[in-house]
């Protein structure tokens, strides 16, 4: 056991986590040179295309140190985006230490801080590493000072390396062996294994990634899942090197995968504890705190025949992504679907893309909303995650919207632009600290504003230098209203949105103008209206197509023309009474773009 080292690699987006993982694998001989590919751990197509890590991946390597001993290194490569912070915290729970990778050119950024604090809270040993020292812009001295000043860990002795060229990678490995403590645990105690991650394999059923805290797990053992109480036989187990390799036993402190032939998606939830069916452990390990979704959106299959497949796909995906929440929902305009909860907009995009690719579905998404706390006149409090569930205006005492605490790190030159943006998003400044050339500002901004396009706008006003980390702070009373969209006087439930009273007029006007572009012209006028309650705040009309009925009159009496026009008008009126409007997919997406341009 004293030769095992478990650690995660944490860093801000694009500071070189996955590349460093590649080097570690290569140096330790986990893969032959032929099998080596750039970012070998980012195995999803989506990850490769976007160049980001979405899922944490674990690898077990053997490393012969300079003292002649062979160490087993279990490491987990983690994502860097705010939306996947939950993946990071789960990975950290399986480790004793973390490598904090910082780009020697960029310096400390917001996610570096957030992830580092998560690691420190879990009592992990944090080892700072300065990466990308081969860049002409690299300034390791300045960055080491920044780490000490902003993060507050000793960094003057930090290992310097370049993951791309391979300089200093040996020092990193030596550092891991010397600085990160060996796992604690009792090999003779009853088995306790923590499920860090699970995914669904069409042939094997549920595959779980586990960290053995106490005891050991062997092939053909009978195990019990503690939350459900079900027992299973272990069919196969092993480690990732990063390929799946079968072994016969997982010992205390090791990280590996287990297949028990579980076919039920809810059979082995993430954060659960496995123990032996006979003489097992009495109490489970402390799991992970459940994360609450921040953004909700309706997802509907384009053709209603796909509903069953869609439900299965969501189930399989939620096994793999523990932060996804879903419940059935039906809409008059879109039929049956699900209301899904996500951690942020990037998470939502990724989930939608994974559903469309991996499960071959066509989906319509409704506008994302956040959760509002509504106090009703009868004294009850309810939580509303969709505009359709908002009670009637007379029944509402007050609506409270979620406020998020945003920590932004930005170079001093762009401070003005960033503050202007925060104020425009109804933000309230909490704190501002200068660290050399970097400024750390803290704002309380309504979640609804952050979720929509705050991140994109922040990047563009600061030329990409600002970085953001946000988390939910509290609910605060606010003047929110629901804007309904009416087509020819009928409400379209899927198009409603909740917005602040001050912005309702502009949002309503932009929305109807945008919708007008997407709805095809019909044989009769289509009135698109935005309304708050019974009060119409904006309107635009898609004009009818009409035949020129008086073309055949050459000269002649005016009453003849009037008669023909009147007849046409009556026909149009009759048509309008029975005609209904088909909404194209683009019209639903129009809401997403309101206020962007």
From Swiss-Prot:
It comes from the Bacteria. Its EC number is 3.6.5.n1. GO terms for molecular function: GTP binding; GTPase activity; guanosine tetraphosphate binding; ribosome binding; translation elongation factor activity. It is a peripheral membrane protein. One of its GO terms (cellular component) is plasma membrane. Keywords: Cell inner membrane, Cell membrane, GTP-binding, Hydrolase, Membrane, Nucleotide-binding, Protein biosynthesis. Residues 2-184 form the tr-type G domain. It is an enzyme of class 3 (hydrolase). It is found in: Cell inner membrane. SMART domains: EFG_C. GO terms for biological process: positive regulation of translation. Belongs to the TRAFAC class translation factor GTPase superfamily. Classic translation factor GTPase family. LepA subfamily. HAMAP family: LepA (MF_00071). This is Elongation factor 4. It comes from Vibrio campbellii (strain ATCC BAA-1116).
């Amino acid at each position: 056991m004293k030769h095992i080292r478990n650690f995660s690699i944490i860093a801000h987006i694009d500071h070189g986590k996955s590349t460093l993982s590649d080097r570690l694998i290569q140096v330790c001989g986990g893969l032959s040179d032929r099998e080596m590919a750039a970012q070998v751990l980012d195995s999803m197509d989506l990850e490769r295309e976007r160049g980001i890590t979405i899922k944490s991946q674990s690898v077990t390597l053997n490393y012969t140190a300079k003292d002649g001993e062979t160490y087993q290194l279990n490491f987990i490569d983690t994502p860097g985006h705010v939306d996947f912070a939950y993946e990071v915290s789960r990975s950290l729970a399986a480790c004793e230490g973390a490598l904090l990778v910082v780009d020697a050119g960029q310096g400390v950024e917001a996610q570096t801080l957030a992830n580092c604090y998560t690691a420190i809270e879990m009592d992990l040993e944090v080892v700072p590493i300065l990466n990308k020292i081969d860049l002409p812009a690299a300034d390791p001295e300045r960055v080491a000072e920044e780490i000490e000043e902003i993060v507050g860990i000793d960094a003057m002795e930090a290992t310097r390396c370049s993951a791309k060229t391979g300089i200093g990678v040996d020092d990193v490995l030596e550092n891991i062996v010397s600085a990160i403590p060996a796992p604690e645990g009792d090999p003779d105690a009853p088995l306790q294994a923590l499920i860090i991650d699970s995914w669904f394999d069409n042939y094997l059923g549920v595959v779980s990634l586990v960290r053995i805290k106490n005891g050991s797990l062997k092939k053909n053992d009978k195990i019990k899942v503690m939350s459900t109480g079900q027992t299973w036989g272990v069919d196969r187990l092993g480690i990732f090197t990063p390929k799946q390799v079968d072994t016969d036993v997982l010992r205390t402190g090791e990280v590996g995968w287990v297949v028990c032939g579980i076919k039920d998606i809810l059979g082995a939830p993430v954060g659960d504890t496995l123990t032996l069916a006979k003489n097992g452990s009495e109490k489970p390990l402390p799991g992970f705190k459940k994360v609450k979704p921040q953004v909700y959106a309706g997802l509907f299959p384009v053709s209603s025949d796909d509903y069953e497949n869609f439900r299965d796909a969501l189930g399989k995906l939620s096994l793999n992504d523990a932060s996804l929440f879903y419940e059935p929902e039906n809409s008059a305009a879109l039929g049956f679907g699900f209301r899904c909860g996500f951690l942020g907009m990037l998470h939502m995009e990724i989930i939608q893309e994974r559903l469309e690719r991996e499960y071959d579905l066509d989906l319509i998404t409704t506008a994302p909303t956040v959760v509002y706390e509504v106090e009703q006149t009868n004294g009850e409090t309810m939580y509303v995650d969709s505009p359709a569930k908002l009670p009637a205006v007379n029944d509402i005492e007050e609506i409270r919207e979620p406020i998020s605490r945003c920590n932004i790190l930005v170079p001093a030159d762009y401070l003005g632009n960033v503050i202007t943006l925060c104020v425009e998003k109804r933000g309230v400044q909490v704190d501002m600290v200068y660290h050399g050339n970097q400024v750390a500002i803290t704002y309380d901004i309504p979640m609804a504003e952050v979720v929509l396009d705050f991140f994109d706008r922040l990047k563009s006003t600061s030329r990409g230098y600002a970085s953001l980390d946000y988390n939910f702070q509290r609910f605060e009373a606010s003047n929110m209203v629901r804007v309904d969209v009416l087509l020819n006087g009928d409400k379209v439930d899927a198009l409603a949105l909740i917005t602040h009273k001050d912005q309702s007029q502009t949002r309503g006007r932009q929305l109807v103008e945008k919708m007008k572009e997407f709805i095809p012209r019909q044989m009769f006028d289509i009135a698109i209206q935005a309304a708050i309650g019974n009060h119409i705040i904006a309107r635009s009309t898609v004009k009818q197509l009409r035949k020129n009925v008086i073309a055949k009159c050459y000269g002649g009496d005016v009453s003849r023309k009037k008669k023909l026009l009147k007849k046409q008008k009556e026909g149009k009126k009759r048509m309008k009474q029975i005609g209904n409007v088909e909404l194209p997919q683009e019209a639903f997406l129009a809401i997403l773009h309101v206020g962007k341009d």
